[in-house]
């Protein structure tokens, strides 16, 4: 069953290269497919840093996360924790 969650971007600079790389590295530790969607409906696969940067997500905006696969719950929980931590930037 696919997992869905919405999370706020907390870090001051939003989704730029450093958080995108952290998310990329995290997602690649799981087998599930992870898709991100911004408030405009633009989608990005989380295994592509360039695609995530195209979401143009700033502090205070929301991202919808979809994880599908054998470890989807673990993947989405870890991704939410990373977003909640502000990508350890602040």
From Swiss-Prot:
UniProt cross-references to CDD domains, sorted A to Z: PTS-HPr_like
Q: Which InterPro entries match?
A: HPr (IPR050399), HPr-like (IPR000032), HPr-like_sf (IPR035895), PTS_HPr_His_P_site (IPR001020), PTS_HPr_Ser_P_site (IPR002114)
Annotated disulfide bonds: none
What keywords appear on the UniProt entry?
Cytoplasm, Phosphotransferase system
Q: Biological process (GO) annotations?
A: phosphoenolpyruvate-dependent sugar phosphotransferase system
**What residue stretch is flagged as signal peptide?**
none
Output a single Gene Ontology CC term carried by this record. Answer: cytoplasm
| Domain called HPr: residue spans | 2-90
Enumerate the subcellular locations listed in this protein's record, separating them with semicolons: Cytoplasm
The cross-references to Pfam families, in alphabetical order and at most eight, read: PTS-HPr
Active site residues according to the UniProt entry: 16 (pros-phosphohistidine intermediate)
Keyword match Cytoplasm: yes
Function noted in UniProt: Component of the phosphoenolpyruvate-dependent nitrogen-metabolic phosphotransferase system (nitrogen-metabolic PTS), that seems to be involved in regulating nitrogen metabolism. The phosphoryl group from phosphoenolpyruvate (PEP) is transferred to the phosphoryl carrier protein NPr by enzyme I-Ntr. Phospho-NPr then transfers it to EIIA-Ntr. Could function in the transcriptional regulation of sigma-54 dependent operons in conjunction with the NPr (PtsO) and EIIA-Ntr (PtsN) proteins.
| Family that this chain belongs to | Belongs to the HPr family.
Q: What is this protein called?
A: Phosphocarrier protein NPr
What organism is listed for this UniProt entry? Proteus mirabilis (strain HI4320)
Its taxonomic placement starts with: Bacteria, Pseudomonadati, Pseudomonadota, Gammaproteobacteria, Enterobacterales
Q: Which gene name does the record give?
A: ptsO
């Amino acid at each position: 069953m696919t997992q869905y969650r919405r999370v706020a971007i907390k870090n001051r600079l939003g989704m730029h290269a450093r958080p995108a790389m952290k998310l990329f590295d995290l997602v690649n530790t799981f087998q599930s497919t992870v898709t991100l969607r911004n408030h405009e409906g633009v989608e990005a696969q989380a295994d592509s840093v360039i695609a995530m940067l195209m979401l143009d997500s700033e502090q205070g905006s929301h991202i919808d996360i979809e994880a599908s696969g054998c470890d989807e719950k673990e993947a989405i929980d870890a991704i939410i924790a990373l977003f909640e931590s502000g990508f350890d930037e602040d």
